[in-house]
């Protein structure tokens, strides 16, 4: 709850133009990624709503409990869902439904904000890893959620994979 309370305090300060919503990958921009965050995002009045271990229902709860109050960011970047596969082994359709609920909340609460939905990041070292397959199945459902007016979808996953579809250990 401490991180949530800090996030709500940051939101209450206002002047949030760029919002990042996600799990530990997003939270990492405030940790190991801090130098990059400071150079590229801090001056853009960015707020980081990434939480280690987060699943779609955790994000939804926080968005409904203060993390969107009183702000009108220009852009919200959303990448969430990989922990649904690992922590609870949610089926892809449930994870996709959770992402859809997050998008619906953002559309309703932030009607003037553009939303960039990123593909769920790949898991597992190899292309045939069971968790990778679950995340791939979620990602197959995400483009249909983008209306190309307010919500846009982008899959950057290939940039992180080697020629055989493997995910290098240093990225994990």
Q: How should each PLM-predicted stretch be described?
A:
Residues 1-72:
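Serine-esterase "nucleophile elbow" of acetyl-processing enzymes
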Residues 17-22, 45-50, 74-80, 114-119, ...:
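Structural recognition of the beta-strand scaffold that forms the well-ordered cores
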Residues 28, 55, 83-86, 124, ...:
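Feature marks short, surface-exposed loop/turn motifs that line or immediately flank catalytic pockets
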Residues 42, 111-112:
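Proline-centered flexible-loop/turn and helix-kink motifs
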Residues 48-51, 82-95, 125-130:
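Surface-exposed cleft-lining segments at the edges of enzyme active sites
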Residues 54-61, 91-100:
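Glycine-rich anion/phosphate-binding loops
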Residues 99-104, 139-143:
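Generic structural signal for well-ordered alpha-helices
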Residues 122-172:
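Catalytic His-Asp segment of secreted/periplasmic serine-dependent ester chemistry enzymes
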């Amino acid at each position: 709850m401490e991180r949530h309370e800090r996030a709500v305090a940051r939101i209450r300060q206002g002047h949030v133009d760029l919002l990042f919503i996600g799990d530990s990958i997003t939270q990492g921009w405030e940790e190991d990624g801090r130098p990059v965050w400071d150079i590229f995002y801090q001056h853009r009045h960015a707020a980081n709503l990434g939480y280690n271990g987060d699943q779609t229902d955790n994000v939804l709860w926080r968005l409904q409990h203060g993390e969107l109050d009183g702000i009108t960011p220009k852009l919200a970047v959303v990448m969430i869902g990989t922990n649904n596969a690992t922590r609870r082994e949610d089926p892809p359709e449930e994870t996709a439904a959770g992402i859809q609920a997050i998008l619906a909340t953002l559309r309703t609460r932030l009607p003037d904000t553009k939303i960039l939905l990123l593909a769920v990041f790949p898991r597992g070292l190899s292309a045939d890893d069971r968790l990778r397959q679950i995340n791939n199945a979620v990602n197959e459902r995400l483009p249909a959620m983008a209306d190309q007016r307010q919500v846009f979808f982008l899959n950057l996953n290939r940039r992180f994979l080697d020629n055989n579809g493997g995910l290098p250990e240093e990225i994990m």
